[in-house]
A protein has these predicted regions:
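Acidic, low-complexity intrinsically disordered regions
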Residues: 13, 33, 121, 135, ...
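Intrinsic disorder/low-complexity segments enriched in polar/charged and small flexible residues
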Residues: 6, 19, 127, 141, ...
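Short, structured coil/loop segments at alpha-helix boundaries
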Residues: 13, 31, 35, 103-104, ...
Length: 378
């Protein structure tokens, strides 16, 4: 009842109930004794109560809330939330309480008390909200509340201020990753009659030498030629693996344990950005998006991804790195693929059948994910 009154009219505060009781008592005493001064006291009390009912809602009428866009962050960092409250009324507003109605998965509503906003002025409120997990979070409203000027009645009103906050998954700082580095070694071994594998797409073969440009990887500098010419020369690479790109695919249409799936998303983000740092052509596949490329697009897709997605796209038939919890899917991987397998906690260890045709990693949730992604594949 109190909530209904506060959001649609006004609800008495503790002081309001006390004054209301006193006014009724004086009015009753005046009826019994016919004393004029009792009527005066009760009349003044009722007048104050009437003002206390009218003024709080009126003080909120001229307030407009605008919200600034929220910059994306990585899980574990703080969201920076900024709101501006404009006072368009002809008189100042005082003793205001502002509450940002966050979604419950992000945190509890955040409150701020504002002493005064002058006529035609604005108040900027900036706060930082911690994040723990990735996701795309949306919320719509900001709640304004006041009991000014008398504090006898309290009212609250909602203002529309829709916003979206994007929290990217964590990216592990991988220093090496055999899943990426050794991708394509089997194919290049079969294609070389001398038994020496060709370079992978991350390395290639030297086509020609050119002057060094700022931003070129140091590993591409040809030191002998640079010493001969007296300037840095860089190898231009001819990619040998037929232009293959590495596709990191998450089995998002399958059933997952929630914690395993969150680890898989972190692994996908870490593998993607490791390959990107190695200047390898890389893409991400999910059941809902299909194949996507580009840092921002991939980050947003991984922020929004969920398991048991209703996707119509099938995994590509080219070699890929398959992240899954279902070992039965490993038997249908394309040639040259790799896999990363999480075990369902409800499945006993001896019941898990792993496909040994392709190398991969079986994740132990008790160990560091970063360490396991950096170890040699089997």
């Amino acid at each position: 009842m109190t909530n209904w009154l506060e959001t649609r009219a006004c609800a008495p505060a503790y002081g309001g109930w006390i004054l209301m009781g006193i006014a009724i008592c004086f009015f009753g005493a005046g009826i019994n004794t016919m004393a004029g001064w009792l009527y005066v006291i009760s009349g003044v009390s009722f007048a104050l109560l009437g003002l206390a009912v009218i003024l709080p809602p009126r003080s909120l009428l001229g307030l407009v809330v605008k919200r600034l866009p929220i910059e994306p962050v990585t899980a574990g960092d703080d969201l920076t939330v900024e709101l501006e409250i404009f006072n368009q009324a002809r008189q100042p507003t005082s003793l205001l309480q502002v509450q940002d109605m966050l979604p419950f998965v992000l945190g509890k509503p955040i409150q701020k008390s504002i002493e005064r906003i002058s006529h035609g002025k604005s108040y900027r409120w900036v706060y930082h909200q911690p994040t723990e997990r990735r996701g795309i979070f949306r919320w719509q409203t900001v709640e304004l509340g006041t009991g000014a000027p008398l504090g006898l009645f309290w009212c609250r009103r909602l203002r529309d201020a829709a916003v979206m906050a994007v929290v990217y998954p964590k990216v592990l700082p991988l220093t090496t990753c055999p899943l990426i580095d050794e991708m394509g070694d089997e194919d290049s071994q079969r294609g070389d009659p001398r038994g020496r594998p060709l370079q992978t797409a991350t390395q290639g073969l030297t086509r020609c030498l050119r002057p060094y440009h700022i931003g070129d990887p140091i590993r591409l500098i040809h030191w002998r030629t640079s010493a001969r010419y007296g300037e840095l020369r860089v190898r231009e690479l001819e990619v040998i693996t037929g232009g293959q790109e590495i596709i990191i695919a998450i089995d998002s249409a399958g059933n997952w344990n929630e914690e395993n799936f969150e680890q898989a998303v972190i692994a996908a983000a870490s593998l993607y950005f490791y390959a990107h740092r190695q200047q390898t052509q890389v893409a991400l596949w999910t059941a809902s998006t299909g194949i996507i490329r580009g840092k921002r697009v991939v980050q947003e897709a991984l922020a929004a991804i969920a398991f048991q997605e209703d996707g119509t796209t099938k995994p590509p038939h080219s070699p890929l790195i398959w992240l899954t919890q279902n070992p039965l899917t490993l038997s249908s991987l394309p040639n040259g693929s790799r896999w990363v397998l999480w075990q369902d906690v409800s499945t006993e260890q001896e019941q898990v059948i792993v496909n040994k045709d392709y190398p991969g990693i079986q994740i132990d949730t008790e160990q560091s994910l970063q360490t396991q992604l950096q170890k040699c594949i089997r």
